[in-house]
């Protein structure tokens, strides 16, 4: 192995170094070389050893860096498995029917069990649904299929009765805004953190214009990020995070508001929120969803949350268990059903009593 060879070479180098010392000392004792020559040679050996160690260190660093480069080139060589259909069509300019899952099953590559099994439901245009269930129920997997980060193992997903695999990928993802629970904290300016939610707007604006600034303002108001921006010394031009000089670190809740603004900036037909307010306090969460129901009027939305106070804003709630849909209906209907949803709701409610 690499460490074994490194040990052998180090031992040989040490033996050669001290072996040379023994030879010149013996030659000095026998009178073949003078004491001055001994001093000169010993100093030369020491300098030569330092030089050789430096060279070996450089080779070791080159070898280490080449491994990183190898990983980088391997990454560049990866070919996407989800590709456009040869006869792709654009996402509907305005959804009329919505999404439909038809007996969808899915398991991750190299996995033994299905993450989702036999799932059938609809998400109507303009409807807001909530996905509820315990960890591992398949909620996040479902929204990955909606965004076509994966294709179903079995079954089909339709958008306005068009197979989602026939829709242009760029067009599909432009019309879907997603905030995952592990959202990314970008060490950019506040403006860049928000506008990166819609790259087309950045590229089309050679300089800051009223239209772009207006969109930023609307997105920050929807997400309550306007309060965060107003508290920053340089406003939208403030660098966020501590990676760069003069950067300002935000709290978890403030970062989450910035991430929400990024999603609103896309102005998509479908907004997916995966635990979007997990870092917000109760008051901020209430304000966010109070605005959410008003501002998402006419647009579709999927909310994933373990907070039952949050999912009540949805038109319909889907309760998932072991990758299957076991209950479906409004909050009132599911409470009347007195099934798994009601059980978990009452369990959570008892914690506040």
List each language-model region with its residue ranges.
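Juxtamembrane transmembrane-helix termini
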Residues: 23-33, 60-63, 77-80
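Cytosolic ends of transmembrane helices, especially the final helix of ABC transmembrane type-1 domains
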Residues: 20, 41-77
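ABC-type nucleotide-binding domain
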Residues: 77, 84-353
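Ca2+-coordinating acidic residues in Ca2+-binding motifs
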Residues: 37, 71, 171
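An intracellular "coupling" helix at the cytosolic face of ABC transporter transmembrane type-1 domains
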Residues: 1-19, 57, 61-64, 80-81, ...
């Amino acid at each position: 192995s690499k460490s074994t060879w490194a040990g052998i070479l180090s031992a040989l180098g040490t033996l050669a170094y001290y072996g040379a010392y023994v030879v010149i000392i013996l030659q000095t004792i026998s009178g073949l070389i003078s004491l001055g020559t001994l001093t000169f040679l010993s100093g030369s050996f020491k300098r030569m050893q330092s030089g050789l160690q430096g060279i070996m260190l450089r080779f070791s660093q080159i070898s280490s860096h080449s491994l990183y480069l190898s990983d980088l080139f391997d990454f560049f060589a990866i070919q996407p498995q989800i590709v456009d259909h040869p006869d792709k069509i654009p996402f509907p300019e305005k959804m009329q029917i919505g999404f439909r899952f038809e007996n969808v099953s899915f398991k991750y590559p190299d996995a033994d069990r299905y993450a989702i099994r036999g799932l059938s439901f609809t998400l109507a245009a303009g409807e807001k649904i909530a996905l509820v269930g315990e960890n591992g129920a398949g909620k996040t997997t479902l929204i990955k299929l909606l965004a076509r980060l994966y294709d179903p193992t079995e079954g089909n997903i339709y958008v306005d009765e068009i197979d989602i695999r026939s829709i242009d990928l760029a067009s599909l993802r432009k019309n879907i805004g997603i905030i995952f629970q592990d959202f990314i904290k970008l060490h950019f300016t506040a403006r860049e953190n928000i506008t990166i939610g819609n790259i087309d707007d950045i590229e089309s604006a050679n300089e800051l214009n009223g239209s772009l600034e207006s969109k930023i303002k609307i997105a920050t108001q929807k997400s309550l990020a306007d309060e965060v921006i107003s508290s920053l010394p340089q406003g939208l031009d403030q660098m966020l995070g501590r990676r760069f000089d003069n950067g300002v670190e935000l709290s978890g809740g403030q970062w989450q508001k910035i991430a929400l603004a990024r999603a609103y900036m896309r102005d998509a037909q479908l907004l997916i929120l995966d635990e979007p307010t997990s870092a917000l306090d109760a008051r901020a969460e209430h304000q966010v969803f109070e605005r959410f129901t008003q501002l998402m009027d006419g647009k579709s939305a999927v909310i994933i949350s373990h907070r039952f106070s949050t999912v009540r804003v949805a038109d319909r709630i889907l309760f998932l268990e072991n990758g299957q849909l076991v209950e479906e209906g409004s909050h009132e209907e599911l409470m009347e059903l007195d099934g798994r949803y009601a059980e978990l709701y009452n369990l959570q409610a008892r914690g506040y009593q």
